[in-house]
Amino acid sequence: MAYCLQCGHQADLCIPTGDSRARLVCPACQYIHYENPKVITGTLCVFDGKILLCKRAIEPRLGFWTLPAGFLELGETMCDGAVRETKEEAEAVAYMPRLYTLFDIPHFGQIHAIYLAQLKDGQFGAGTESLECRLFAPSDLPCDIAFASVAQTLDYYKKDVARFGNDLASYPLHQTVITT
């Protein structure tokens, strides 16, 4: 951003009074532009013990497998965003969602929130951002997973299945910082 979002004047990079970080500040109207992390939200949808994955039709990681997920939109909760992304990417209805994994990814300026949910009626299809969608048994997951947060979520799920069986309500919330 080179220009003020409020008045259009050229913004300067400086440390505002009372702050400790350099930010873009408008010298004309004093508007401070804060760049904050983006929230990515999605679901780990389960049907008959199998996990719904989508093969990406877009970059980044075109052709790799991922959970249905995407950027949170203004005005929606993380849970609503996760359900929406599942509908958009996998033409699926996620129900009974609850927060399952939360990842801080500071080097990308992102937070990933994945909800554990049930796949309604086992129905799904490929949305416009997916080449295909498929159900996988935890023991049969593909090795070409798109993102570290997805791989870690799938690993947590496999361990929780081994520990708690199919009692999804017993699965704990996992919180992790990804640094690489």
What do these predicted ranges mean?
Residues 1-42:
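Acidic, metal-coordinating catalytic segment for phosphate/diphosphate chemistry
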Residues 28, 56, 69, 117, ...:
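Active-site donor-binding loop signature of nucleotide-sugar glycosyltransferases
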Residues 22, 48-50, 122:
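Beta-strand-connecting loop/turn residues
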Residues 72-156, 160, 167, 178-180:
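Unchanged
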Residues 171-175:
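Short, highly charged C-terminal tails/helix-capping segments
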Residues 21, 38-40, 46, 60-62, ...:
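Short connector loops at helix/strand junctions that flank enzyme active sites
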Residues 45-46, 53, 117, 135:
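Conserved hydrophobic "DFG−1" position in protein kinase catalytic cores
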Residues 46-88:
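Conserved Nudix-box catalytic region and its N-terminal flanking loop in Nudix hydrolases
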